């Protein structure tokens, strides 16, 4: 019983810390990190989180984090809710954007980094907290259950910063930008 109480204590401590701002993008508020046991609503989760949750008011444009092809649209009310899955096949990775009010793209469509692909919302298992769930998969994984970390990886190390139309991004690896617009001048120094 002691290990369970100790683990619950850690979860409650983490929950009390609240949201964090992304160091490289002061506009981006991370509500729940990869593998976190605290949800976007700051309550304990039953399973580790398979992505990152970013605060976004309902109706905020969600941007493609990298060039890709829409591999599927998701409608999974017990998990992702309305979502978009982008394939980045040159890197054998997929990015998943969940809890949208609606998508602006269709399967098979080519998208460019920074292109609006949908609007943020509270669909699916969002705990009624408006946010965007960003997930990176090594296999198409949008329909898996959150907490199943197989085939997922932490998106944060792949983030190159805020989207800037005039910036060149690495082409030898998957470099993502935040899926939410940053204020002008808020772009980061992490290149």
Task: List the predicted regions and their residue ranges.
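Short peripheral tails and domain-boundary helices/loops at the edges of structured domains
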Residues: 98-99, 137-165
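Positively charged n-region of N-terminal signal peptides that target proteins for export
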Residues: 1-6
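Bacterial N-terminal signal peptides
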Residues: 7-16
């Amino acid at each position: 019983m002691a290990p369970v109480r100790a683990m619950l204590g850690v979860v409650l401590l983490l929950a009390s810390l609240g949201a964090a701002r992304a160091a490289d993008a002061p506009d981006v508020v991370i509500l729940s990190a990869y593998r976190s046991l605290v949800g976007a609503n700051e309550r304990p989760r039953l399973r580790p989180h398979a992505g990152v949750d970013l605060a976004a008011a309902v109706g905020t444009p969600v941007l493609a984090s990298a060039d890709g092809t829409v591999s599927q649209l998701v409608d999974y009310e017990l998990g992702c809710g309305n979502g978009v899955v982008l394939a980045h096949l040159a890197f054998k990775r997929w990015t998943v954007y969940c809890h949208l009010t609606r998508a602006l793209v269709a399967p098979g469509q080519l998208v460019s980094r920074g292109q609006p692909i949908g609007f943020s919302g509270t669909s699916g298992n969002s705990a009624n907290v408006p946010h965007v769930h960003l997930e990176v998969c090594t296999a198409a994984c949008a329909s898996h259950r959150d907490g199943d970390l197989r085939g997922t990886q932490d998106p944060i190390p792949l983030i190159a910063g805020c989207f800037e139309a005039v910036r060149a991004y690495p082409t030898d690896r998957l470099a993502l930008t935040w899926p939410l617009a940053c204020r002008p001048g808020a772009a980061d120094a992490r290149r």
